[in-house]
Amino acid sequence: GDVYKRQVLEQALLGVAASVGNLGVTEDKERVGKVFDQLFFMGYWVFGFAGICLFEMLNPFVELAFGSQYLFQREIVLVLCINFFINGMRRAVLIFKESMGLFWYDRYKAVAEAVLNLVISVLLVTYLGVAGVFVGTFCSTVLTSVWVEPYVIYKYRLERPVTGFFIKYAGYLGVMAAVWGITEYCCRFISGQVFFVLVLRLMICLIVPNILLWLVYRKTVEWRELWSLLKRIVKFP
C-alpha cells in the first residue's frame, strides 16, 4: 500500500530527504530546485526499477508459493505496476511538498481525486472487470495529483513555470517505458521450472534496467549527485 511505498522511498532517499526540511528556511530557490530535481530523479529510478521487478516476478513468485490457480491476469499486473510506479514518483513530490508546508494550495485535490476515481472505476468495471478499478485509480491520479502537486511546488515555492518539469517528466516516462519494454523482451525467452524462471528473471531485472538507465543518464547532473550519495551511504571510495 501507500505506507509501504513511502517507507521504501524514504529509506532509499534517506540522505536527501534528511536535508529537505532544512530547505524550508532558505530563500535560495535555485538550491531548492536542485534538491527537488535530485529527489525526483531518485524516486523515478527507484520506483521504475521496483515496478519492473514487480511486473516480471510477481506471477512466477505467486505460482511458486501458492500455485498456478492463483495467478493474476497479465493486464491487471501491468496496471498495478504502473500505478505503483506513478505513485512512487509522487512520493518524492509529496516529501518535498510536506517539508515546505504547502498544504493549503491543493486542499481540494483529494476530494476531486476520490470523486473521479469512483466515477471512472464504476464506468470501466463494466467493460474491463476488476482491471477497470485499477485503471480508474490510474486515471484519477493522472487527472489530479500528478500535475497539481508539482504545480503547487513550482508556483508557490520555486516561483517559476512548471512547464520544464512536465517536459522532463514526459522524457522520464518515455525512457522508462523503453527500458521496461526491453526488460520484458529479455524475460520472454525464459521458460522452464518456475523456480529457475524466477531466479533468471530476478537476475535480468537487477542488471538490464539499471544498465540501460545508467547508459541514458550517466552524463547528467542528477546521476552524478545520485552516485555521490550512494557512495556516501555505502562508504565506497
PLM features: residue spans?
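Short helix-capping/hinge motifs at transmembrane helix termini and TM-loop junctions
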Residues: 57-59, 66-70, 101, 124-129, ...
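Alpha-helical transmembrane segments of multipass membrane proteins
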Residues: 2, 46, 50, 54, ...
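Interhelical loop/hinge segments that connect adjacent transmembrane helices in multipass membrane
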Residues: 16, 21-34, 152-170, 224-228
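Specific pore-lining/lateral-gate transmembrane helices of multi-pass inner-membrane transport
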Residues: 1-110
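Membrane-proximal transmembrane or re-entrant/amphipathic helices at the cytosolic face
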Residues: 160-161, 181-237
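Residue-level signature of transmembrane alpha-helical entry/exit and packing/kink sites
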Residues: 72-76, 164, 168, 172, ...
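Short runs within selected transmembrane alpha-helices of multi-pass transporters and secretion channels
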Residues: 10-11, 56, 75-101, 105-125, ...
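Transmembrane alpha-helix boundary/anchor motif
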Residues: 12, 52, 56-60, 119, ...
